[in-house]
Structure formats: structure tokens, C-alpha cells
UniProtKB/Swiss-Prot annotation:
The keyword Cytoplasm applies. Component of the small ribosomal subunit. Mature ribosomes consist of a small (40S) and a large (60S) subunit. The 40S subunit contains about 32 different proteins and 1 molecule of RNA (18S). The 60S subunit contains about 42 different proteins and 3 molecules of RNA (28S, 5.8S and 5S). Component of the ribosome, a large ribonucleoprotein complex responsible for the synthesis of proteins in the cell. The small ribosomal subunit (SSU) binds messenger RNAs (mRNAs) and translates the encoded message by selecting cognate aminoacyl-transfer RNA (tRNA) molecules. The large subunit (LSU) contains the ribosomal catalytic site termed the peptidyl transferase center (PTC), which catalyzes the formation of peptide bonds, thereby polymerizing the amino acids delivered by tRNAs into a polypeptide chain. It comes from Plasmodium falciparum (isolate 3D7). GO terms for cellular component: cytosolic small ribosomal subunit. Belongs to the eukaryotic ribosomal protein eS12 family. It is found in: Cytoplasm. This is Small ribosomal subunit protein eS12. Signal peptide: none annotated.
Length: 141
């Protein structure tokens, strides 16, 4: 044995900066889902907006009912809650919110679409959350 101690090689992993809205939205929704901070579906989202419990809302641009879009947009503007329009399919929003079953290989199947999702608890702070909140009130992703 030698008298010289070997220095620990601490590897610091740097996080990539978030530059697109879709990735940031995915990370924020998944983080909120892990910390049980999501409201999914039109009824829960409207309740959380009216009680001003929602911190941010996501609305699928491909929503089948135009009245839903108008209602959520108006309520978010009235209560000053940031609203992000997600141009992806509502099944993508549902997948990000955890509305699916896993098959034997661990792949998502039976994905249920979600027209709207509200975040009431972000969980832990992240660069993605800061990036989204620094954007305008109504952003198209």
C-alpha cells in the first residue's frame, strides 16, 4: 500500500440547456406527475383554475371540442394563469401525463388522450420550469 491517497474522480454531469418548448413541457409534466401535482381532464383543470390552485395549464391544440379551448383560454386569462397550447396530438399530452398502460417490454400502449392538463405542484425546481415560466402567457409549443 502506498502512502499517497488516490483522488476521487468526481464526474459532474452538466444538464443541457432547454431550448424548445416541447421538451420543457414534457419534463415539467412528468416531474409534476411524479410528485402528484397534475390535474388531468377538463373538469379537474377547470376546478383548479377557478380555485387558482393551478400554476400553469397545457391545452391540446387538436382538442375535439372548440368550446373547451375557448373556456380554458378565457379562464386562464381571467385568473392570470400561464397557458401553453400544445400542437401535438392529445394522445401525446396524455402520454406525458401518464395516461397509458405498459406492455411486457415496457413500451406504452393503450394511450388515452388528454385535452388539457394543469400543474398544481411542480415538485422540484428545474431549468425546464424556469424556461417555461419565462415565456409569454400564451405560447404555442
Amino acid at each position: 500500500m502506498s502512502d499517497v491517497e488516490s483522488a476521487d474522480n468526481n464526474v459532474v454531469v452538466e444538464e443541457k440547456a432547454v431550448f424548445d418548448n416541447v421538451t420543457a413541457i414534457q419534463k415539467v409534466i412528468k416531474n409534476a406527475h411524479v410528485h402528484d401535482g397534475l390535474k388531468i381532464g377538463i373538469r379537474e383543470v377547470i376546478k383548479s383554475i377557478e380555485s387558482q390552485e393551478a400554476k400553469v395549464c397545457f391545452l391540446s391544440d387538436v382538442c375535439s371540442e372548440p368550446a373547451y379551448k375557448k373556456l380554458i383560454t378565457t379562464l386562464c386569462a381571467e385568473k392570470n394563469i400561464p397557458l401553453f397550447m400544445v400542437q401535438n396530438d392529445s394522445k401525446d399530452l396524455g402520454h406525458w401525463a401518464g395516461l397509458f398502460k405498459l406492455d411486457n417490454e415496457g413500451n406504452a400502449r393503450k394511450i388515452i388522450g388528454a385535452s388539457s392538463v394543469a400543474v398544481v405542484d411542480f415538485g422540484e425546481d428545474s431549468a425546464e420550469k424556469d424556461f417555461l415560466l419565462s415565456q409569454n402567457q400564451t405560447v404555442t409549443a
